[in-house]
Amino acid sequence: KDFGSWKFCDEDDIRKVVGDNIGKIKISVMADAERTDYHEDILPKEDSVLDMIRVATYIHQIPTAIDMIKDASDKGYETTCNLMAISTVQEGQIRSALEALIETPVNTIYVVDSFGALYSEQVRDLTKMFLDYAKPAGKEVGIHTHNNQQLAYANTVEALIEGANRLDASLAGLGRGAGNCQTELLVGFLHNPKFKLRPLLQCIRDYIEPLREKLRWGYSIPYMLTGRLNLHPREAMKFMEETDAKDIVAFFDSIYEEE
């Protein structure tokens, strides 16, 4: 079995967790372009506990992503578009995608550092570019970072300072591979009294840390190397899953030979 139930986010599974009355909490799912039968898989909003559909797309999938956004919006959902692997895309292609996206009902457009390859000045420039298109169209800009080079938190803060106001984060950086920006770090930076750190730490202690013992995520040298080379982390993930994943020099040699 390659995937667990949360790969698919079936409505019944979600309801088992959140119930029917979830108050002010917003629930969202990620839908990958070209990897879902979204016309059938995504229910009308009135039949779902979901509030938001987050469409994840590579640059060559933009036409499909736009149709997914329109479909989800027509069904009553808030929508976002996550432009993945942005570190591999030429500026002209990014601008063309943004021009198309601002004509859709999408609420937020995300800068996504899928490979954990971006540095702060690149994040600033990309955030400014996204805002140049999104803000006049009445849309928000978000940031989604990966921690390959220990920059997920710092780059999220850079985007926030530039004007991004949708910040992706997870408790203890929980996420595939190198993980993501840590929620508990952001709470400290925001200095907003409505955000309480202690309940987050309690959740990390009770639920996230036990998971960490079973699932390996977070910064490691193999993920750092793929981030430096602006590569998909699949080779690092494969290496980390091996029984003797200690020869980091051999891994270095293997990926630099490929380069």
Predicted segments with their positions:
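Catalytic cores and adjacent flexible loops of soluble metabolic enzymes
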Residues: 1-259
